[in-house]
Amino acid sequence: MIVTVTANPSVDRTIGLPHALARGEVQRAVAVTAQPGGKGINVARVVHGAGLGTVAVLPAGAADPLLTQLAAVGLPHRAVSIDEPVRTNVTLAEPDGTTTKINEPGAELSAGDLARLTDLVAEAAADARWVALCGSLPPGVPADWYAEVTARLHAGGRRVAVDTSGPPLLAIAQARPDLLKPNAFELAELVGGDGARLEAAAAEGDLE
């Protein structure tokens, strides 16, 4: 069993445009899709598709469209109820493949919301081998929350993987998760250096 945690989930809407985006003009969409999003949910979707046990843990109100979408695709999930709606992220897709992304900050979690989410993660992880803490943290959540959750999970004998960036990445590194997944730019945040140079070196097979 792999439990995924998405503290800042989203409904991801993609709007297809008939031509290049023109600022300041009215443009009509040629296609619109919406699906549940957030890094942890995406990981759970892949794990579930591979036929392995998984459950996605997240904050969302009982009537939130995100939970309806998760149920529609048959993805196992457990949610802590919150008052604010889950954020909507919008991608504007042009015919040549160019995309413009607009991401909302997310629903603010109160101290009570966060405490209940932390408890639910620990409860869901009772039968798990791995817990994946994924994505950004929403407003109201301290940068060291992933580190706090990791310590609690380690105390229960669970293995923890983390995929995040910015201040939460810097904080979690000190908690020594079992797996940390930075890209080149995030690795540069941790160890210093130039992310673009690290990425170019990796692309060329130069790992020194």
Regions found by a protein language model. Give the residues of each.
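Glycine-rich phosphate/adenosyl-contacting loop at the front of the ribokinase-like
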Residues: 1-55
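Cofactor-binding loop segments of dinucleotide-utilizing enzymes, especially the Rossmann-like FAD-
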Residues: 5-9, 59-61, 82, 136, ...
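Short, acidic/turn-prone active-site loops that include or flank metal/cofactor-
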Residues: 9, 30-33, 84, 105-107, ...
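Conserved phosphate/ATP/ADP-binding segment of small-molecule kinases
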Residues: 144-160, 164-208
